[in-house]
Amino acid sequence: MDRNSNPNRQPVELNRTSLYLGLLLVAVLGILFSSYFFN
């Protein structure tokens, strides 16, 4: 039971972290592109 609980918990945390990182990356890319377009 402990073995099953651990792998189940890790992917959820990883998915959340990757999701937040992805959003941050998209925001940074958007700002960079917008600055390029404005210039």
Swiss-Prot record:
Disruption phenotype: Very poor to no photoautotrophic growth, no O(2) evolution. No assembly of PSII monomers or dimers; the CP43-less monomeric intermediate is assembled. The keyword Transmembrane applies. The keyword Transferase does not apply. Keywords: Membrane, Photosynthesis, Photosystem II, Reaction center, Thylakoid, Transmembrane, Transmembrane helix. Its main location: membrane. It holds the Pfam family PsbL. It is a single-pass membrane protein. It is found in: Cellular thylakoid membrane. GO terms for biological process: photosynthesis. One of its GO terms (cellular component) is photosystem II reaction center. The chain crosses the membrane at residues 16-37. Belongs to the PsbL family. PSII is composed of 1 copy each of membrane proteins PsbA, PsbB, PsbC, PsbD, PsbE, PsbF, PsbH, PsbI, PsbJ, PsbK, PsbL, PsbM, PsbT, PsbX, PsbY, PsbZ, Psb30/Ycf12, peripheral proteins PsbO, CyanoQ (PsbQ), PsbU, PsbV and a large number of cofactors. It forms dimeric complexes. One of the components of the core complex of photosystem II (PSII). PSII is a light-driven water:plastoquinone oxidoreductase that uses light energy to abstract electrons from H(2)O, generating O(2) and a proton gradient subsequently used for ATP formation. It consists of a core antenna complex that captures photons, and an electron transfer chain that converts photonic excitation into a charge separation. This subunit is found at the monomer-monomer interface and is required for correct PSII assembly and/or dimerization. This is Photosystem II reaction center protein L.
